[in-house]
């Protein structure tokens, strides 16, 4: 639904929820930004990613050198960019005080990077509950998710925004 309204999916390209969200967006011709845990040349060696780039269906962004390989540290750093590029995020399952999902959500809350919503319905993890205690918004059901305004309303300007100068 969010993609059909024009929202862009920002994906860490990880297996699991990241790939499912990315695939669902692509199935309905949505836009996807991929933030890999390795250099762009490395991730582009994967046939599926390379084909999506060539078709103009995904934009890859990375703060890392093009040929850099995977490391846990880079994966943790990548999460910052996923949150920073997002207006809002949904944490489906987080470990308690460990792992990339926890670190990214915790940092996003501390830095006020993006709205952080956390699944608190059936099957919610202890990490999810703890993130709500730190300020994330609880989402106890699918209906609540859609009704909560997770999908931000488009910005409306009375006038055109001012173009800032770089130099």
For the regions a protein language model found, what residue spans apply to each?
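Glycine-biased, small-residue-rich flexible motifs in mid-sequence functional cores and linkers
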Residues: 1-167
